[in-house]
Amino acid sequence: MNKKIKTEAVDSLFDAILSLESREECYSFFEDLCTVNELLSLSQRFEVAAMLKCGKTYLEIAEKTGASTATISRVNRSLNYGNDGYELVFDRMGK
């Protein structure tokens, strides 16, 4: 865990997210919290991670998602050398 982000404010945000009970509640909360572009960027990174996990090439990912190679590379680095957060979520989602 990155100690730079471990703050009371971040803990409070994560507690708020964990309190959400449905996809509709997530839409309501995240539409209030994030700009459209911020939310689309987060979802793009998640899609990139899923495609990398499935063995897709950078070219295939860039064509489907519109992500830059820099974004794809950053996500790939997180998948390979990060805190296993993507893996945890993918396992729970059955991906």
Which positions does each model-derived feature cover?
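Short, amphipathic alpha-helical "recognition" segments used to contact nucleic acids or chromatin
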Residues: 42-56
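General nucleic-acid-binding
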Residues: 1-20
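Short alpha-helical "recognition helix" segments of helix-turn-helix
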Residues: 60-65, 72
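Short, Lys/Arg-enriched anionic-surface-contact patches
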Residues: 25-44, 94
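General marker for long, soluble alpha-helical cores
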Residues: 59, 87, 92-95
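Major-groove recognition helix of helix-turn-helix-like DNA-binding domains
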Residues: 48, 72-79
